[in-house]
From Swiss-Prot:
PANTHER family: GTP-BINDING NUCLEAR PROTEIN RAN, TESTIS-SPECIFIC ISOFORM (PTHR24071:SF2), RAN GTPASE (PTHR24071). This is GTP-binding nuclear protein Ran, testis-specific isoform. The modification N6-acetyllysine is found at residues 60, 71, 99, 134, 159. It comes from Mus musculus. Residues 7-171 form the Small GTPase Ran-type domain. InterPro entries: P-loop_NTPase, Ran_GTPase, Small_GTP-bd, Small_GTPase. The gene is Rasl2-9.
Length: 216
């Protein structure tokens, strides 16, 4: 029996992607309001508890922050077991992290079939983007949701959890009644840049998918 005020609804979400894409920063931004400027390879797994208040009551996400380093690959099945949803993250300033997205997706769906998955391109506050909206096709081919995000500016930070909450609860009218407490942005996301990215994504969504069998 949950204590009074404790969320009755909770979900396990696994956060995966290459090392250095900002997964741990993503979580710590929510929970402690700290942005990690120094990259420290995550050892093992940390479970972060994140509560969102919605018009359907509080929802708790138990976020498993998995190691992005391949040397920990043997442990990943254990991370994935009983996951109810997932976030795959890549770094828009690093093409290789996007090229590795299909591998993360394959590992994930091998253990967890038919769970809602969000693909996130992090670090969009950096103007020198290497991965643009038009070539980001993987989510369309695999029917995943996609968001540009930025830890440093808080841009779109709650969007992945908002989309997952609606999917998991099965209510398209679910709304957050309070935003999570985040630290003040370290940088300001240029509104014109954000508008351009959103426009580019909209255009990309209406572009026909290429015929080739390339995963990306």
């Amino acid at each position: 029996m949950a204590a009074q005020g404790e969320p009755q609804v909770q979900f396990k979400v696994v956060l995966v992607g290459d090392g250095g894409t900002g997964k741990t920063t993503f979580m710590k931004r929510h929970l402690t309001g700290e942005f990690e400027k120094e990259y420290v390879a995550t050892l093992g797994v940390e479970v972060h508890t994140l509560v969102f208040h919605t018009n359907r009551g509080p929802i708790k996400f138990n976020v498993w922050d998995t190691a992005g380093q391949e040397k920990f690959g043997g442990l990943r099945d254990g991370y994935y077991i009983q996951a109810q949803c997932a976030i795959i993250m890549f770094d828009v300033t690093s093409r290789v992290t996007y090229k590795n997205v299909p591998s993360w997706h394959k590992d994930l769906v091998r253990v967890c079939e038919n769970i809602p998955i969000v693909l996130c391109g992090n670090k969009v506050d950096v103007k020198d983007m290497k991965v643009k909206a038009k070539p980001i096709l993987f989510h369309r081919k695999k029917n995943l949701q996609y968001y540009d995000i930025s830890a440093r500016s808080n841009y779109n930070f709650e969007k992945p959890f908002f989309w997952l909450a609606r999917k998991l609860i099965g209510d398209p009218n679910l709304e957050f009644v309070a935003m999570p407490a985040l630290a003040p942005p370290e940088v300001v996301m240029d509104p014109a840049l954000a508008a351009q990215y959103e426009h580019d994504l909209e255009v990309a969504q209406t572009t026909a998918l290429p015929d080739e069998e390339d995963d990306l």
